Amino acid sequence: MRRSFARIACVLALCAFIEVLPASLRGAALEKINASYGAISGSMLPIWVTKEAKLFEKQGLELNLVYISGGPRAIMSLIGGSVQFVNHSGMPALEAYQRGADTALIASPMNQLEHSLVVQKNISSVEQLRGKILGMSTAGSLTDILLREGLRLNGIAEKDVTILPVGDLGARLSALQTGRLHGVIVAGVQTLTATKMGFKQLIDFSKLPIEISGSGILVRRAYVMRNQETTLKFLKAWIEGIYLVKTKPEFSLGVLRKYGATQDVEVLNSIYGHYKDKLDTKPIPLGRVAKSMFYLLSRTNPEIPSGNPEGFVDARFINQLESAGFFDEMNRQYGK
């Protein structure tokens, strides 16, 4: 009889042990989800690192990660249901929210501008931009909105320049090299790439009085409310990816080399150092940042419906993780 009880106790202990193992180690089927990222930029390093380190699998998720250039296209994919999570600037999703969509910002590790206007080396002042042709990614994108506002804050009206949608960073720099454009807007350490090519930084957007969510996690409320556990698993994986970026430089640089469209060691090290220092390991989305983004949208798009931009922010999932001790666990594992 005692042997039977001992056997039962062993089986129960084994079951309990298996239950606390990550899904990837239990042999459980992984839940398939789709996510997109919106830039070939160091701001996307956390989701790239999370993917390459198999942290999504650790949480029981099989992530199909795709690149979608341009905020409006990414948000159309989100609303249409082809992706469940979007890692992108919050601006296009906020505009969709103000127009009645159920989009929300649930995490944001960076809330400052990191863009620059780089120009041909014969342009030495903002005044010389009058009559020039400038490039951004796509109409209505973050680069479009910021370029127009940056010009306005520096005393240049939109009517005084021509602004063209050109495409991703490679297309913009190529157009600058051929002389088709006189200036383009770039982000983060892309400025270093441009200056190494002989171009000049004319406007540093980080000095403007504006906050934005530059690389947040965007969702549809209908999806996350139906799939709260999946959402928490996604955030756990992605946030651990932020910790990994900050503590594992060699691995992170290898990932950056794979995704970042450059093999230049100086550029890679500069990108890594820049984002390692700026990423917040507790990425709480903030209402004041939503208000700042709405201000930007309304400056360039006056007919956008007014309302409550703070309602775009949903911090419940980050707050749940904090209450459950997740951040304490990460700090113990990786060091605060």
Outline where the language-model segments fall:
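Bacterial N-terminal signal peptides that target proteins for export
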Residues: M1-V11
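Bacterial N-terminal signal peptides
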Residues: A9-V20
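Sec/Tat signal peptide C-region and signal peptidase I cleavage site
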Residues: L21-A29
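Short, glycine-/small- and polar/acidic-enriched structural segments
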Residues: A28-T178, H182-G188, Q201-F205, I210-E211
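Pocket-lining segment of extracytoplasmic ligand-binding domains
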Residues: M91-P92, G170-A261
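Secondary-structure end/capping motifs
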Residues: M225-G307
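Conserved C-terminal helix/tail region of periplasmic/extracytoplasmic solute-binding proteins
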Residues: S298-K336
